[in-house]
UniProtKB/Swiss-Prot annotation:
One of the protein's GO biological processes: exocyst localization
Family, as annotated: Belongs to the SEC6 family.
Cellular-component GO terms for this entry: cell projection; exocyst; Golgi apparatus; midbody; perinuclear region of cytoplasm
Protein name: Exocyst complex component 3
Gene name of the record: exoc3
Organism of provenance: Dictyostelium discoideum
Taxonomic classification: Eukaryota, Amoebozoa, Evosea, Eumycetozoa, Dictyostelia
Record keywords: Cell projection, Coiled coil, Cytoplasm, Exocytosis, Golgi apparatus, Protein transport, Transport
Skewed-composition ranges (Low complexity): 260-285
Disulfide bonds listed in the record: none
């Protein structure tokens, strides 16, 4: 495309401006139709141009006016400088002309200096003579705390006079001693005044309730002193900076000039001091002598130190007496908490907000509370540790006191903190009571274990009652009444940590109760009457229900986090286990009566008389007369199943380990025994269950009486349900048969071994069961 050259625009010499204008034109007239609006655009641009020209004209006029005024000011200044030069020259000339007109000028000059010095000395003497009067006035003002500001102003004035006098006469020992004697009352007054200030600060809470205005005045005095300290630091910093830059006074000034300068400074200081005396309540920190140092500690730091000492002094008696009278200590602690409300409502209002006194008091009091309770807790713990057993003995501190402390912290203190507007404070005060909670837990542990032992002993000595047709004792009621009592006591404190601790010991005690019960049932069941053993079954089943109730109750008391610390599952399983062991104990009682009869099985006597019937009769007698009416139905079924399993296991042990040979009557007698077992146990168990249990006797009957070829078949039937059987069992049985040879036995045992290897694929994890419990690996079993 051909490039079209642009015609330069009139009035636009700058190329960038021309380019911008051309782009604007291209933008507004990009097509032919837009040319119709050329006139409108032209009018608009002309109007904009006029507006811009008017603005520029105004700005130029304004700048010209400013420049004109500046030139006028510069011209006037130049004229004044010229006149000053002329006047100075005239003055020098006049001074030179008149210096010789006055006779004895130098002498007159010295006399005048002496006169000025004498006047100043007389003024100083007059001021010094008023010191006793001012000291007496301050002494009188000290009797009323409301005069603190006035006392502070007057006392600081005396201190400044004292300091200046010491400076002026420091080269004359006699005069210096006289000055010290004259001002002897000033240091004492200062000391008394400061002690008064800090005594008021120490007793801020008490004074705030009587004369809060006094605290306001003390705060003003402290602020004055802090401001003075700040100014002194700034001056020292400036002086250090000047010294570092090498700036110093001219050492060549003559003596007369130095005296005059000193006198001038004295006059200026005297004027300032008079001004201060006339306006005591408007204290000007700037009238302090630059070189004056009162050698006092930082007022801000001293203020905090006094408060901390005051608070420590209040707590010291409680630290000393808490272990002797905890109740009184807790009353004192309540008073201290009440003081925090006074601080919030009155004391903090008397001091500047920057002091943040309320939070300071809260932090200090909370720290002291934590230390107080912590030291008391540690003292109680250390004084009750038995080094032989490492247990805490709780005779010297009543558990009621521990509960009282915990309840106060959780209820009262937390409520008061909330009223004070404090939502969270660290460390939690309850943490300081951890040693006491530990002591209380040990108390619960000992108490619960004593109760458990007593309950078990009494339970075995007394005959159980029949409740709803079942044997029951008071053991569950007594046990869980004690548990509920301890839970209620702990819950009353509203302390979840204590509830968790108590329930941990309760869980431990319940498991201890279970262990003791199991030990008794397993090792001494022969000493316990049958009805008591039956009561154990029923009781522990009820204990399971009671435990569930306790779990529900605890879950309503604790939040989910604290509830997570407790595990009741072992307790629930433990009570079921006790009932199981009690059921086994009933079985042991019954089988003690059957022991002699069972040992006759598969002997000569077994062939001569019916031994199964006496066993069935014994079962019938126990179950019908002594057990069925007094035991829970589900445990009756478990007992029946246990009796059947135990009997079958003992019969198999007799069968496998028998030393008598089988004969032609073996099959018939075994069949009769199996039928009698089925007939009896089907009354208490499902027929399918009894049949499955008795099937193993049927299979052994077939292995004893069938042909040698069928033995592996019946062995397979047995191993399907009893994986722990092996070829050794079959070997012991087959060697009691008289109708087969050893070679046949050897051959069939090979087949049996193959079956066993097929089933037992993991030699490191052998199966367990009836046969694994039998001692069948001793060769003495062979006849």
């Amino acid at each position: 495309m051909e490039t079209v050259s642009l015609v330069p625009l009139e009035g636009l010499d700058d190329l960038s401006a021309q380019s911008a204008a051309i782009k604007k034109i291209e933008q507004n007239f990009s097509n032919i139709d837009s040319l119709a609006s050329v006139t409108n655009h032209k009018i608009s641009l002309i109007q904009q141009k006029k507006t811009i020209e008017a603005q520029i004209k105004n700005e130029v006029h304004s700048e010209l006016e400013k420049s004109k005024k500046g030139l006028e000011t510069l011209y006037k200044s130049y004229n004044r400088i010229n006149r000053m030069d002329e006047s100075f020259s005239d003055t020098v000339e006049l001074c030179s002309e008149t210096s010789n007109l006055i006779g004895h000028y130098q002498l007159i000059k010295k006399v005048n200096t002496v006169r000025v010095n004498l006047i100043n000395i007389l003024k100083e003497v007059d001021r010094l003579l008023t010191i006793p009067e001012k000291a007496a006035e301050i002494e009188q003002l000290l009797s009323d705390d409301l005069n603190l500001l006035e006392i502070h102003s007057k006392l600081r004035e005396l201190e400044r006079l004292h300091q200046k006098a010491l400076k002026q006469f420091e080269s004359n020992f006699e005069e210096l001693e006289a000055i010290k004697e004259m001002f002897s009352s000033v240091p004492e007054l200062s000391h008394r005044f400061e002690n008064k200030i800090w005594n008021i600060v120490s007793n801020s809470i008490d004074i705030a309730q009587i004369k809060p205005a006094v605290l306001v005045k003390v705060a003003q005095i402290i602020e004055r002193e802090k401001l003075h300290e700040q100014k002194q630091k700034e001056k020292k910093s400036q002086n250090s900076l000047i010294s570092s830059e090498g700036i110093h006074d001219d050492d060549d000034d003559d003596d007369d000039t130095e005296v005059n300068l000193n006198n001038s400074n004295k006059q200026q200081n005297n004027e300032n001091e008079n001004s201060s005396s006339n306006n005591n309540n408007n204290y000007d920190i700037n009238n302090e002598d630059e070189g004056y140092d009162r050698n006092r500690s930082n007022y801000g730091d001293r203020f905090l130190e006094v408060l901390i000492q005051s608070i420590s002094g209040k707590f010291e008696p409680m630290f000393l007496n808490s272990h002797n009278d905890l109740v009184q200590t807790l009353k004192d602690v309540n008073k201290m908490v009440d003081e925090l409300f006074i601080v919030m409502d009155i004391v903090q209002e008397c001091y500047p907000p920057s002091y943040d006194l309320f939070n300071f008091y809260v932090d200090q009091y909370h720290t002291k509370f934590y230390s107080l309770f912590g030291s008391f807790s540690n003292l109680m713990e250390s004084s009750h540790v038995n080094n032989n057993y490492q247990v805490v003995v709780t005779k010297n501190i009543p558990s009621a006191h521990i509960l009282m402390l915990v309840e106060w912290v959780v209820k009262n203190y937390s409520r008061d903190l909330s009223r004070l507007g404090i939502q969270d404070i660290s460390p939690p005060l309850l943490d300081s009571l951890d040693p006491l909670i530990k002591i209380y837990k040990m108390h619960i542990k000992q108490l619960m274990r004593e109760w458990c032992d007593n309950i078990i002993n009494n339970d075995n000595q007394n005959k159980p009652e029949v409740v709803d047709g079942q044997y029951c004792s008071l053991a569950p009621i007594q046990l869980f009444e004690s548990v509920a009592s301890q839970l209620d006591i702990a819950a009353a404190t509203k302390c979840q940590k204590l509830v968790v601790g108590v329930m941990e010991e309760v869980v431990s005690a319940l498991m201890y109760f279970q262990v003791q019960s199991i030990t008794l049932l397993q090792e001494r069941n022969h000493e316990i009457k049958l009805e008591n053993v039956i009561a154990y079954v029923n009781n522990n089943s009820k204990c399971y229900d009671h435990t569930q109730t306790i779990v529900d109750k605890v879950s309503n008391i604790l939040d989910s986090e604290h509830m997570g610390y407790l595990d009741f599952d072992p307790v629930l399983e433990g009570f079921l286990n006790v009932s199981k062991v009690a059921t086994q104990a009933i079985s042991s009682v019954i089988f003690r009566d059957l022991d002699e009869c069972i040992h006759k099985f598969y002997t000569v006597e077994w062939y001569q008389e019916d031994l199964m019937q006496p066993i069935i009769n014994t079962f019938e007698d126990y179950v019908t007369n002594d057990i069925q009416k007094y035991i829970l139905e589900n445990y009756l079924k478990r007992l029946a199943l246990l009796l059947l399993d135990t009997l079958i296991e003992q019969l198999l042990a007799q069968l496998i380990g028998g030393k008598n040979k089988f004969n032609e009557n073996t099959y018939k007698i075994l069949s009769n025994d199996c039928d009698k077992l089925l007939d009896f146990f089907k009354k208490y168990l499902r027929l399918s269950v009894v049949t499955a249990k008795v099937q193993i006797l049927e299979d052994f009957k077939q292995m004893i009486t069938s042909s040698i070829d069928m033995v592996p078949v019946y062995f397979r039937s047995v191993i399907n349900f009893h994986k722990d059987i092996n070829e050794r069992v079959v070997e012991l049985v087959l060697y009691q048969r008289t109708d087969i040879s050893k070679s046949e036995i050897t051959e069939v045992l090979g087949q049996i071994k193959t079956i066993v290897e097929t089933v037992h694929t993991d030699p490191t994890n052998p199966p367990t069961g009836i046969f694994s419990r039998m001692n069948i690996y001793q060769r003495g079993w062979f006849s």
